[in-house]
Amino acid sequence: MTDVRLPLRALGPFATGSIGMGIWVTVPGLFLLYFLTDVLAVPPLAAGLVILVPNIIDVVLHPWVGRLSDTDLARRGHRRRLMFTGCLVVLAFVALFAVPAGLRGIPAAVWVAVVFVAGNLLYSCYQVPYLATPADLDIGYHERTRLMGYRNVVITIGVLLSGVTAPLLTGDDPGVGDYTLMALILGAAMLVAMVAGITGVTRLKQAAPGTPPEPGHRTGLLVALRDRQFRALTASYLTVAITMNLVLAGMPYFAKYELGRATLTTVLVAAFMAPAVLATPLWVLVARRIGKQRGLLAAQAGFVAGSLVLALGSAAGLPVLIGAVAVLGMAFAAMQLMPLSMVPDVIAASGPGGTARAGSYTGLWTAAEATGGALGPYAYSACLALGGFVASTADEQTTQSPGALAAVRYGFTLVPAALMTVAIMLQRRYTLDNTANTGSSGLGLRDHSMQTVLPGEPSDAT
């Protein structure tokens, strides 16, 4: 069993890399559907397909990228080559919102879809080796939670800042030019953060090098697919990813059509993300006290409760709704931290040579995340279409029917509550944490000498 403590000089840059990832996930997740329907006049179902189809393609590519990452590790001793390639996602991020003048409706949808396919592929080249890093390191059960705790705090800050900054940069009733300026500014921040993340990965590998994999390993995907614990964990996470991406896509609509002011999107994002930042260190302590699985189930139940309160709509009053969104944010922190720190546990328990399969496991995991990114906005767009929502351009004023307004509200609240209930049932099938949290020699899952250090707390390894 290992007692390695990861130094802050490595944890900081590694966590910083997730800011770039957070911008790519958050800004399109929060604004792309709205950008298509309310700026480019793309009908809701077509707009949903623009997000769905590229992400379906992405699902197929992620396991392949995972295999490439494992091959790089075996041949070169690191996964950084793909990460440098992935930094080019910044170009796709800018192009996504820099739609050529005159393109509206279906032609604009085609432009966005093509760029989104390229961007998702480049993003996976960075994301897959980045998230494989914890499994590559010679660290224990609690240190994995500590590592992902740092990462979770920083990515949540990145999501908060980008989610709040983007609406401020675009303003009220923005046009394509406003979105392009926003993409240029946030794209520059993406690039700086992602390069820092590569530095962090290098330092982590120096601090806790794992067992070098043997070249020619070819069983990672099959082992991952046959792993019952991994399947249970991934199925639940897929449902969570669908739910969270639906919520992100629905926020601008809920602010504009239910609360009456589009600018309240910034307030909702802040109310969601700020508690998530503050709650992450507490969830690290919860994981140490009662285990990751129990903490995750409690967070999922809290999310269901908060969604049901939001279903009351504007009649509940803005303070109550903001409080409910804050509950969702605190639950979101656990739903990011716990599963991502459980994946390396599963890999460690999968048998000898787990490091050589980490990219394959992570590729399948990020494929599930990409599926959630596709199905969440599409599910919300389907709700809008069923309610009779009418698309428009930025300079048009469209009055929505009562059915469309009901779809805006309940698609944002009751549908996520139902999906999260399904996620809870799937998550209960995961049982590895019972063994990991009570001690299991030979799996590298238990480390009695480890002290969990929260973000910002001094470490004797620095």
Annotate each PLM feature.
Residues T2-G444, V453-L454, A461-T462:
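Membrane-embedded alpha-helical bundles of multi-pass transporters/translocases
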